[in-house]
Amino acid sequence: MNIVENSIFLSNLMKSANTFELKYDLSCELYRMSTYSTFPAGVPVSERSLARAGFYYTGVNDKVKCFCCGLMLDNWKRGDSPTEKHKKLYPSCRFVQSLNSVNNLEATSQPTFPSSVTNSTHSLLPGTENSGYFRGSYSNSPSNPVNSRANQDFSALMRSSYHCAMNNENARLLTFQTWPLTFLSPTDLAKAGFYYIGPGDRVACFACGGKLSNWEPKDNAMSEHLRHFPKCPFIENQLQDTSRYTVSNLSMQTHAARFKTFFNWPSSVLVNPEQLASAGFYYVGNSDDVKCFCCDGGLRCWESGDDPWVQHAKWFPRCEYLIRIKGQEFIRQVQASYPHLLEQLLSTSDSPGDENAESSIIHFEPGEDHSEDAIMMNTPVINAAVEMGFSRSLVKQTVQRKILATGENYRLVNDLVLDLLNAEDEIREEERERATEEKESNDLLLIRKNRMALFQHLTCVIPILDSLLTAGIINEQEHDVIKQKTQTSLQARELIDTILVKGNIAATVFRNSLQEAEAVLYEHLFVQQDIKYIPTEDVSDLPVEEQLRRLQEERTCKVCMDKEVSIVFIPCGHLVVCKDCAPSLRKCPICRSTIKGTVRTFLS
């Protein structure tokens, strides 16, 4: 298709500029018009009015789509105005917002054309009242004076809410001829929508007009663009293009949609919802649990100083959204900080050591400035809360969280009191959890500690299984699931993990039944307490695929004993529950370590 071959005006204009290039993309009305070649003839709305309103034809019935905001419309009726419908249904669309400003520019610039040129332009290009037709740079010294005036006028038309001439990545890349930095590549900047404007390292986005400078060595162009200008139409278009990567939750693919889920985010959590949403996470509504819209990775138990992007790269390095926004180099640096993470995840689930031990967690507390603390705590609202009897340390902690999350202190006593009451509820819940753990019987602790050894040494599974059924600890379905395992070792594994989930009463029944069924094993486990785990082989040298296969060997959820396991707990690495049972758990039922995150697995 050659849209300029019959236009003397455009042909002369192109000949006058050595660097000029006409780009065929959907931001150009002429190009949008070309998509209507197969548009149904009976539709009562003209193709020209649809293209002028920012729509291109999708090829399905009379359905059209906006190149900028992605709005899709069909079932057109007589009297419909595409532009008005566009404005009404998606008023925030950048293209729609630019229409009025473009029309104003058009009115002021029109007199600069001689009447002959104006008439020629309108007859040859009936759609030139809108911006966005020409892409590239224009010659500073055209040979034809008519073309010079035309260049001036089209430049004015393109001064809308975005820089149309920089719409093309190659055009943006050409502006970096004198780029001063070596650690940030012009290619990455151009790909992220930026073109160079100077001075120094100052760049601007062609779509939203946002400007950035003072770049640092670890900065990623795309992620900085997203962080500073999350509503940029270019960024939103990049993130919404699901053909670029597989998305787990389509409804959460926009930053705005994810951010809205944090409306009841606990004030006690010292991580900013804006940062979480930017990193691809949305709030699932339970405690501080979040999930990535793309890879479906889940994280929880956020602490002060946690960086959502770092945690995303640490636990889910293959997330396609993460790779696209932060880049492989960022992920490589994060992974390099945790060189044995995969080995730890794979080995912990089968570690013979004390499984009650908590994994170490990096905890970064914000530094305290006593003068700032005095100012922060010396307000009528804060003093009123303290006078009500709330602990000053709790008030201070709550105020710090509020300032970290919103950037401002409490203005109303009611808001502060509500958050303080919620914080007290959370503290009581944590205390109840600790009390429950402290009440674990010695029998259960011994079984948990020697879990791996019992997998090896326990042989009389069925009598113990029958005792649990008789005592009402397990039901017939749970009994049959374990009994139907083809190998004794597999039966033992399922039995022990089920006892750990069921708790103290199950442990007592196990002890009494074991004394009758296997007296020697009972003696070593409960009396002498010298039962030993005997490594059968070193699995660390096996391929990762084989380690994962072994990790995924047992497929029955230890909570419901019905569905297949599909959730790996982080950081302990246990794969013991299904996706439906996982959200209700705060601690791993096998080792009782706090669940910091989850990874969804798909077993073949």
UniProtKB/Swiss-Prot annotation:
The record marks N442, D443 as: Breakpoint for translocation to form BIRC3-MALT1. Highly expressed in fetal lung, and kidney. In the adult, expression is mainly seen in lymphoid tissues, including spleen, thymus and peripheral blood lymphocytes. USP19 regulates the stability of BIRC3/c-IAP2 by preventing its ubiquitination. One of its GO terms (molecular function) is cysteine-type endopeptidase inhibitor activity involved in apoptotic process. Zn(2+) binds at C292, C295, H312, C319. Auto-ubiquitinated and degraded by the proteasome in apoptotic cells. Keywords: Apoptosis, Chromosomal rearrangement, Cytoplasm, Metal-binding, Nucleus, Repeat, Transferase, Ubl conjugation, Ubl conjugation pathway, Zinc, Zinc-finger. It catalyses: S-ubiquitinyl-[E2 ubiquitin-conjugating enzyme]-L-cysteine + [acceptor protein]-L-lysine = [E2 ubiquitin-conjugating enzyme]-L-cysteine + N(6)-ubiquitinyl-[acceptor protein]-L-lysine. A zinc finger (RING-type) spans 557-592. One of its GO terms (cellular component) is nucleus. It is found in: Cytoplasm; Nucleus. Residues 439-529 form the CARD domain. BIR repeats lie at residues 29-96, 169-235, 255-322. One of its GO terms (biological process) is regulation of toll-like receptor signaling pathway. Multi-functional protein which regulates not only caspases and apoptosis, but also modulates inflammatory signaling and immunity, mitogenic kinase signaling and cell proliferation, as well as cell invasion and metastasis. Acts as an E3 ubiquitin-protein ligase regulating NF-kappa-B signaling and regulates both canonical and non-canonical NF-kappa-B signaling by acting in opposite directions: acts as a positive regulator of the canonical pathway and suppresses constitutive activation of non-canonical NF-kappa-B signaling. It is linked to A chromosomal aberration involving BIRC3 is recurrent in low-grade mucosa-associated lymphoid tissue (MALT lymphoma). Translocation t(11;18)(q21;q21) with MALT1. This translocation is found in approximately 50% of cytogenetically abnormal low-grade MALT lymphoma. Belongs to the IAP family. Interacts with PRSS25; interaction inhibits apoptotic suppressor activity. The BIR motifs region interacts with TNF receptor associated factors 1 and 2 (TRAF1 and TRAF2) to form a heteromeric complex, which is then recruited to the tumor necrosis factor receptor 2 (TNFR2). Interaction with TRAF2 is required for ubiquitination of IKBKE, degradation of NFKBIA and activation of NF-kappa-B. Interacts with RIP1, RIP2, RIP3, RIP4 and USP19. This is Baculoviral IAP repeat-containing protein 3. It comes from Homo sapiens (Human).
